[in-house]
Amino acid sequence: LFYMDRANYEKALKNEDDSTIVEQAITKDGEQNFSWHSESAYGGGGETNVDVEKNKNKRKAVYAMWSEDSKHIAITKVDNRKVKELWVINSIADPRPTLETYKYWMPGEKEAPIDHLIIVDMTAYTYKEINVSLFKDQDVAVWNKTNNVNTRDDEHKPSIWLGTNDKLYLSRTSRDLKKIDQCVVDIKTGAVKTLLEESLNTYVEIQKPGILKISEEFIEWSERDGWAHLYLYDK
């Protein structure tokens, strides 16, 4: 994981291979299939094996969510190292068929991707993992703040986490999709608080919760009685 200042970022936008670009490393522990690059646990990135080798030294995208004060980012780092491979052959590629190899978790397989929630301090350039584990082979999703309508035409729209500078909201889902927790995380202490639990004997659908900023009340969309309703929870 690297960072650069705006001047160098603007250089990279013009020419990614500019040798005068200065960037600093925040982490050095990334490895294939467990990197800081935003790798999917459910499909490939569309690159053929030849393209992967050709582009292996290029910068890769990181999907991160910022705190409102821009002092921290949240990253879900996925460990795909034990997940088995899947292949796609493009038989009509010109001049010869191409092969794409990626990690893919099939139903019934034990080797599952593992989600790790990482908080990076963008003032000290340090990071720590938050323990959000509960369900076996769970999926973790940090909720993003909905952009204001008046920003829809802005050239730059940062991804900001739902919450405050010190707290963020996330969901964790069991492998069978029948249990979902809505949680709030205190990024300073690392404390994870379960706000509510959804559990059904069928698939549970979930929507992003609404947070009332002044009262800190919590609005949840749920089908717990067989119909979709909105529920209001106090602090």
Task: Locate the predicted segments by residue.
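Hydrophobic beta-strand positions in blades of beta-propellers and related beta-sheet-rich domains
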Residues: L1, E23, I73, L117-I119, ...
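Conserved blade-ending motifs and adjacent loop-strand segments that build the rim/top face
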Residues: L196-Q207
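Beta-strand C-termini and the immediately following turn/loop, strongest in propeller blades
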Residues: F2-R6, M65, A74-D79, P107-E111, ...
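Long hydrophobic segments that form regular secondary structure
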Residues: D121-M122, K128-K136, N148-V149, E155-L170, ...
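Surface-exposed loop/turn elements that mediate protein-protein interactions on large endomembrane-trafficking
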Residues: M122-I130, V184-T194, L230-K235
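A short beta-strand motif characteristic of beta-propeller blades
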Residues: V52-E53, K128-I130, N147-V149, K193-E197
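Signature of short aromatic-glycine-proline-rich micro-motifs recurring in repeat-based ectodomains
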Residues: S38-E68, H116, N144-G163, Q207-E220
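Predominantly five- to eight-bladed beta-propeller fold
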Residues: Y9-M65, I75-D137
